[in-house]
Amino acid sequence: MKIKKLISALVLGSMLVGLSGCNITDFSAENLLRPPKAVGDEAEIEQLIAKTADSGYTLKYPKNGKFRSAIIMTDLDGNDSNEAVAFFRNSAETSSVHMLVMYSKDNSWEIASDNIFETTDIDSVDFADLTGNGKAEIIVNSTTYTPNVGKLSCYSYSEGKTNEVGSGQSCSSFVTGDFDNDGTSEIMSFVLYTTENEALASMLDYNEDSKSLYAKAMANMDPNVVKYKNIAVTKLDNDITGIVVDGTSANEVTNTQVIFYSRDLAILRNPLFKEKAKNITRRSSQVICSDIDKDGKLEIPVTLDLPKQSSDSKNIYADKIIWNSFDTPKEALVAKQAVIINYDYMFMMDYADKWSENKVTAITDLESETTSFYAWNGTKLDTELFEIKVFPVSEWESGKSDDFTLITKDDKYAYTFNNINPDTQISLSDDEIKTGFSTLDQSGI
């Protein structure tokens, strides 16, 4: 809110200055959001950037990934002292971005290298020890003129010097981790399909002899995916570290691909993708892989339709989600938990064992902010079992909701239930409703 007020004040100020005949030439959002004047180390670093740029500069912020700052402080060489990596565009240049690597020596900041990318933006940045020497490499994906496909570059730093380790691989997104369990990190690079690139996952490893990166293993990816929604490193089983990739097609259908390196076969695997077969995780829902049981491993969602009347086009039916672990030896999903998810009000309800064989469905009424759970008799709705109602906190605290019992609340909403029919064979008790309910935030979704 403070930032919004600051921007509003600055915009108003610019209008007044404009009316007085002054000319403001660089009033971009990036400049508006630049931090206050730096002091100490930050001031010295910005002075080095200004000196290098000479004619003025604009800080460039990575668009994606873990590191979103234009000036990143991190210990590259493992000496417990931070180096600085800064991204900026020289005001005299329009199609290049500089990466300035700086280090502190004798209480003064010096430049290790000024690396120039032929690009207008930096997509993402990461740091990982790819060589096994205890020092972190700088990994940069810079944008290109091909939409959603960038160019991967990698640099090592030691004793005030920066060397290029690898450059030139096409890359839409990347993650790092020890995927072959050899004690050092690798880069897993993903490329979306274009007329110039196959949809591909590549595991890039460091070669000590050539002092460069090479593709140790590759796997085909789904060419119908046009956008990545979520790419996350996760433990699978048998001490294997893999990646789950949630991607979306042009018609907004999402699927999940699981990528891992098979040490026995020395190949990269993507078993959920088969060229002539439907991916079992294909779904129109917005859910992505999540660690729903907090065991440190991401679960993979499979969406099933709840039963509905064929002629019913009015009601909004909830989704049934089966959360699965991944069995690496069998290369198959293993069901762990079934839930009914409501995306409108961001909660889910455990799908009880007694509801097996499509005995229950759920309908959301947006006007009344209620999701009703019904018994299903095979062709139509039967008895209403219970309902979940979402109240604004202020309304709930006013006491105008005597028929409902509180489950949980946050700053905005109170989540409540009314157990309408607790005595059928498939009914839930009050305690079962309370323990089976969770918000998507609570579940990490």
PLM region descriptions:
Residues Y374, D410-D431:
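Domain-scale activation on soluble regions of proteins
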